A protein has these predicted regions:
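A general structural motif
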Residues: 15-17, 78, 97, 151
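Adenosine-phosphate binding glycine-rich loop
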Residues: 94-186
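A short helix-to-beta-strand connector/capping loop
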Residues: 38-44, 149-150
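Conserved SAM-binding loop of SAM-dependent methyltransferases across substrates and taxa
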Residues: 2-11
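Glycine- and other small-residue-rich loops at beta-strand/loop junctions that grip anionic moieties
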Residues: 20-21, 82, 157-160
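NAD(P)-binding Rossmann-fold cofactor-contacting core
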Residues: 10-37
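Rossmann-like adenosine-cofactor binding region
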Residues: 41-121
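Gly/Ser/Thr-rich loops at beta-strand to alpha-helix junctions
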Residues: 1, 25, 158-162
Length: 186
Protein backbone atom coordinates (compact mmCIF):
# COMPACT_ATOMS: atom_id res chain seq x y z
CA UNK A 1 0.00 0.00 0.00
CA UNK A 2 2.88 2.36 0.69
CA UNK A 3 4.10 2.28 -2.90
CA UNK A 4 0.58 2.90 -4.21
CA UNK A 5 0.23 5.88 -1.88
CA UNK A 6 3.57 7.25 -3.08
CA UNK A 7 2.48 6.80 -6.70
CA UNK A 8 -0.84 8.57 -6.12
CA UNK A 9 0.81 11.50 -4.39
CA UNK A 10 3.31 11.81 -7.25
CA UNK A 11 1.01 11.20 -10.23
CA UNK A 12 -2.13 12.91 -8.91
CA UNK A 13 -1.02 15.93 -6.87
CA UNK A 14 -4.43 17.53 -7.43
CA UNK A 15 -6.20 14.95 -5.24
CA UNK A 16 -7.81 16.68 -2.29
CA UNK A 17 -8.09 13.59 -0.08
CA UNK A 18 -6.84 10.02 0.04
CA UNK A 19 -8.48 7.53 2.41
CA UNK A 20 -6.31 4.61 3.48
CA UNK A 21 -7.96 1.44 4.77
CA UNK A 22 -6.25 -1.68 6.04
CA UNK A 23 -7.56 -5.15 6.73
CA UNK A 24 -4.97 -5.46 9.49
CA UNK A 25 -5.37 -3.22 12.48
CA UNK A 26 -3.57 0.09 12.62
CA UNK A 27 -1.31 -0.16 9.55
CA UNK A 28 -3.31 2.56 7.82
CA UNK A 29 -2.86 4.93 10.78
CA UNK A 30 0.91 4.47 10.73
CA UNK A 31 1.01 5.04 6.96
CA UNK A 32 -1.04 8.23 7.23
CA UNK A 33 1.11 9.50 10.12
CA UNK A 34 4.29 8.89 8.09
CA UNK A 35 3.10 10.58 4.87
CA UNK A 36 0.80 13.41 6.00
CA UNK A 37 3.74 15.73 6.84
CA UNK A 38 5.04 15.25 3.28
CA UNK A 39 1.90 16.34 1.41
CA UNK A 40 -0.83 18.96 1.29
CA UNK A 41 -3.32 16.25 0.28
CA UNK A 42 -5.49 15.28 3.25
CA UNK A 43 -4.73 11.69 4.23
CA UNK A 44 -7.26 9.88 6.39
CA UNK A 45 -7.07 6.50 8.09
CA UNK A 46 -10.50 5.03 7.39
CA UNK A 47 -11.89 2.79 10.11
CA UNK A 48 -13.93 0.70 7.68
CA UNK A 49 -13.90 -0.22 4.01
CA UNK A 50 -17.30 1.42 3.59
CA UNK A 51 -15.94 4.73 4.90
CA UNK A 52 -12.84 4.51 2.69
CA UNK A 53 -14.85 3.73 -0.46
CA UNK A 54 -17.60 6.30 0.09
CA UNK A 55 -17.21 9.00 -2.54
CA UNK A 56 -13.85 7.65 -3.77
CA UNK A 57 -13.08 8.41 -7.43
CA UNK A 58 -10.17 5.95 -7.51
CA UNK A 59 -9.89 2.70 -5.57
CA UNK A 60 -6.62 0.79 -5.39
CA UNK A 61 -6.61 -2.65 -3.79
CA UNK A 62 -3.19 -3.96 -2.86
CA UNK A 63 -3.67 -6.78 -0.37
CA UNK A 64 -2.99 -10.48 -0.14
CA UNK A 65 -6.64 -11.21 0.64
CA UNK A 66 -7.53 -14.89 0.25
CA UNK A 67 -11.23 -14.00 -0.17
CA UNK A 68 -12.81 -11.04 -1.99
CA UNK A 69 -14.02 -8.11 0.08
CA UNK A 70 -14.83 -5.46 -2.56
CA UNK A 71 -18.52 -5.62 -3.44
CA UNK A 72 -20.49 -3.59 -6.03
CA UNK A 73 -21.58 -1.03 -3.42
CA UNK A 74 -17.94 -0.12 -2.75
CA UNK A 75 -17.59 1.00 -6.38
CA UNK A 76 -20.62 3.32 -6.51
CA UNK A 77 -18.61 6.54 -6.77
CA UNK A 78 -15.43 5.13 -8.26
CA UNK A 79 -14.55 5.65 -11.89
CA UNK A 80 -11.23 3.76 -11.73
CA UNK A 81 -10.31 0.61 -9.84
CA UNK A 82 -6.72 -0.67 -9.81
CA UNK A 83 -6.43 -4.34 -8.87
CA UNK A 84 -2.85 -4.81 -7.74
CA UNK A 85 -3.21 -7.40 -5.02
CA UNK A 86 -4.44 -10.97 -4.90
CA UNK A 87 -8.17 -11.76 -4.56
CA UNK A 88 -9.89 -8.54 -3.47
CA UNK A 89 -12.91 -8.16 -5.73
CA UNK A 90 -16.10 -10.18 -6.20
CA UNK A 91 -17.36 -11.27 -9.59
CA UNK A 92 -20.47 -9.10 -9.09
CA UNK A 93 -18.23 -6.06 -8.57
CA UNK A 94 -16.23 -6.81 -11.73
CA UNK A 95 -19.50 -6.80 -13.67
CA UNK A 96 -19.83 -3.06 -12.86
CA UNK A 97 -16.95 -2.12 -15.17
CA UNK A 98 -17.44 -0.86 -18.70
CA UNK A 99 -13.81 -1.52 -19.59
CA UNK A 100 -11.19 -3.88 -18.19
CA UNK A 101 -7.54 -3.20 -18.98
CA UNK A 102 -4.77 -5.65 -18.07
CA UNK A 103 -1.01 -5.25 -18.14
CA UNK A 104 -0.83 -8.75 -19.57
CA UNK A 105 -3.38 -11.40 -20.44
CA UNK A 106 -1.71 -14.34 -22.12
CA UNK A 107 0.94 -14.79 -19.42
CA UNK A 108 -1.57 -14.65 -16.56
CA UNK A 109 -4.89 -16.12 -17.66
CA UNK A 110 -4.02 -19.72 -16.83
CA UNK A 111 -1.81 -19.25 -13.76
CA UNK A 112 -2.68 -16.11 -11.78
CA UNK A 113 -4.54 -16.33 -8.49
CA UNK A 114 -5.88 -12.80 -8.91
CA UNK A 115 -9.65 -12.38 -8.94
CA UNK A 116 -10.06 -11.53 -12.63
CA UNK A 117 -8.07 -14.54 -13.83
CA UNK A 118 -9.81 -16.90 -11.38
CA UNK A 119 -13.20 -15.77 -12.68
CA UNK A 120 -11.98 -16.25 -16.26
CA UNK A 121 -10.96 -19.86 -15.54
CA UNK A 122 -14.31 -20.44 -13.81
CA UNK A 123 -16.11 -19.22 -16.93
CA UNK A 124 -17.54 -16.14 -15.19
CA UNK A 125 -15.51 -13.54 -17.12
CA UNK A 126 -15.08 -14.03 -20.85
CA UNK A 127 -12.21 -12.84 -23.01
CA UNK A 128 -14.59 -10.36 -24.66
CA UNK A 129 -14.70 -8.43 -21.35
CA UNK A 130 -11.00 -7.53 -21.69
CA UNK A 131 -10.98 -4.18 -23.49
CA UNK A 132 -7.24 -3.79 -23.91
CA UNK A 133 -3.79 -4.41 -22.59
CA UNK A 134 -1.87 -1.53 -21.08
CA UNK A 135 0.69 -1.83 -23.87
CA UNK A 136 -1.95 -1.40 -26.59
CA UNK A 137 -3.28 1.72 -24.86
CA UNK A 138 0.20 3.20 -24.48
CA UNK A 139 1.03 2.46 -28.12
CA UNK A 140 -2.28 3.94 -29.25
CA UNK A 141 -3.41 0.79 -31.05
CA UNK A 142 -6.48 0.65 -28.80
CA UNK A 143 -8.48 3.32 -27.02
CA UNK A 144 -11.13 3.32 -24.34
CA UNK A 145 -13.42 6.17 -23.26
CA UNK A 146 -12.30 8.28 -20.33
CA UNK A 147 -13.37 6.79 -17.02
CA UNK A 148 -16.33 8.30 -15.18
CA UNK A 149 -18.90 7.20 -12.62
CA UNK A 150 -21.05 6.01 -15.51
CA UNK A 151 -18.15 4.41 -17.40
CA UNK A 152 -16.02 2.58 -14.88
CA UNK A 153 -12.57 1.25 -15.78
CA UNK A 154 -10.77 -1.61 -14.04
CA UNK A 155 -7.01 -2.01 -14.40
CA UNK A 156 -5.58 -5.39 -13.39
CA UNK A 157 -1.84 -5.38 -12.76
CA UNK A 158 -0.56 -8.94 -12.88
CA UNK A 159 2.98 -7.60 -12.72
CA UNK A 160 5.45 -8.18 -15.49
CA UNK A 161 9.19 -8.67 -15.11
CA UNK A 162 9.67 -5.95 -17.74
CA UNK A 163 8.64 -3.40 -15.11
CA UNK A 164 11.28 -4.72 -12.72
CA UNK A 165 13.88 -4.55 -15.48
CA UNK A 166 12.83 -1.01 -16.40
CA UNK A 167 13.08 0.18 -12.80
CA UNK A 168 16.47 -1.51 -12.42
CA UNK A 169 17.72 0.25 -15.56
CA UNK A 170 16.59 3.64 -14.23
CA UNK A 171 18.18 2.93 -10.83
CA UNK A 172 21.49 1.97 -12.48
CA UNK A 173 21.49 5.08 -14.66
CA UNK A 174 20.85 7.31 -11.65
CA UNK A 175 23.53 5.54 -9.62
CA UNK A 176 26.08 6.05 -12.40
CA UNK A 177 25.12 9.72 -12.72
CA UNK A 178 25.55 10.20 -8.96
CA UNK A 179 28.66 8.00 -8.91
CA UNK A 180 27.11 5.58 -6.43
CA UNK A 181 27.59 1.84 -6.14
CA UNK A 182 30.25 -0.50 -7.41
CA UNK A 183 30.92 -1.44 -11.02
CA UNK A 184 30.80 -5.20 -11.49
CA UNK A 185 32.42 -6.79 -14.53
CA UNK A 186 30.15 -9.39 -16.10
Amino acid sequence: AEHQLQALLYACPELSEIAVWSRGGEKNQRLVARYQPKTETLLTAAKTLDVAAEGADIIIAATSAPEPYLEPQHLEAASVYCHIGFHEITHAAIERFSDIVVDTWQEAKDVSGQSLFRYYREGLVGLERISSTLGALLLGTKTIPRASRDHKVMFDAFGLPIFDISFAKIACERAKKLQLGTNVAW
